[in-house]
Amino acid sequence: MIVSRFIIKLKTPLHCGGGESLFLDGPVSRDPFGYWNIQGSSLAGVLRASLREIDKDLADSLFGFIKGDLSKASLVWFSDANLLDFDEKRACDKAGNGENVEIKTDSYIRDHVHLQEEGLNRGTSVSGHKFDEEIVPPGAEFAFELKFDEWQYSSDDVQKEKEKFLLLCKIIASSQVRLGGKTVNGYGCFETIYAQYHEVDMRSEDGITQWLNLDNDVCFTSSDAIDIEKDATIVPSKEGYSFDISIPLQNNSMFLPGGVSAKEEDVGTDITCLTTPVLNYKNKTKCIDVYTATGSSIRGAIRHRVFEICNALNLENSLAIEIFGCEADESSKQGKAGLVSCDDAYLKDIKSCVMPHVKIDSFTGGNVDGALFYENPLCGNIGGNIEFDLHMEGRKLTLPQLKILAHALLDLCNGELAIGAGCNKGYGFFKLKGLGEDIKENLSKITLHLFKDGTLLDLSKIDIRESLLSELENA
């Protein structure tokens, strides 16, 4: 028997669906005490899907299968991932024992609007399709454990199955999966801050005694616990091209990532910038509201540019649809998940400024009576710049898809693609930080890990940036 325990910390919002609600379109899952949680079935589903992309037989061996008359039980047991209080104890345990729980699990909402699939160059919304969803804020910490039970194996086969289970643990420790739904919009990204396992021999009397005396704390207290190593080269897909890229962007003008702001200085303003609540366990404080460029907004801007590139090159729109996915078709009733995801960008130490506007009558050229409104775009920090790192991940891409996507990212780096609202006023045009005349020099500032068929490409031997640049010039 192997028991592994983990503590994870959310880097982006999490949305694990919690059924229906009278007041919310998409509530999150909560335990009986009302605290956020991630169900064990959700953890098992994500990790099984990840293993199936690495090795289908490996996934069937650990998680079991049913194939006609053949079947096999799962060897892995999952607990729910329980929310931790600021003292690193399970909030549900403290509530059950009548102890005071400091962390507040209010309802945090994000609004969305559905965009038309046809006429993508317009990017217009569909009437009556505004919806909201509840999120678990970044910074929240959860604890859970996995158990490996090799009861149906002989001692000769146990070592093989143990290695498979430890690979599964390594995937979690390396934060190589995303949890919950909406992952293409950057949700569900986490970092593992604790990962250890403890092994006991259930075939011996001493092992059974160790098992019975094993503590139920969040972390192991025994010195026999072994650290689970991390491996950044694990990729959940061995098909096509996969990548993760981080691009430092900079803007010296206004930026308007529209949404609901919880900051006091934005109260009463007609158009505000979105804020995201972020938990801070170190200072044991309630959520701090941070201005945010959402992953869905960044991904949407890149998506539209990819469609424009396809149209300009007389390529089929199906190339772009395969990259970003599509909703269910009325005839086939089948949708398609996207292959790329973008994380939220949190804009710290950024201030907003009040910009008054008045609607102009196009016939008289004068102002329309009573049509004065205000907006609060972001105007940068003390240095006057707005900076953030764009983080994007992709999987199972073909080479043509990779080239088209690289073309759109180059447009973004060159200040030719806007993010957020107000682009007709010059808002939201970012450039690669420190962009100069030498495009090759500035491309080297981008952090890129590229995999082909599951193998990490050595960029010191294969100048993939040079190759992409050459392909784009030829296109």
Question: What is each model feature region?
Answer:
Residues 1-475:
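Small/polar/charged residue-enriched interaction surfaces, especially the RNA/DNA-contacting tracks
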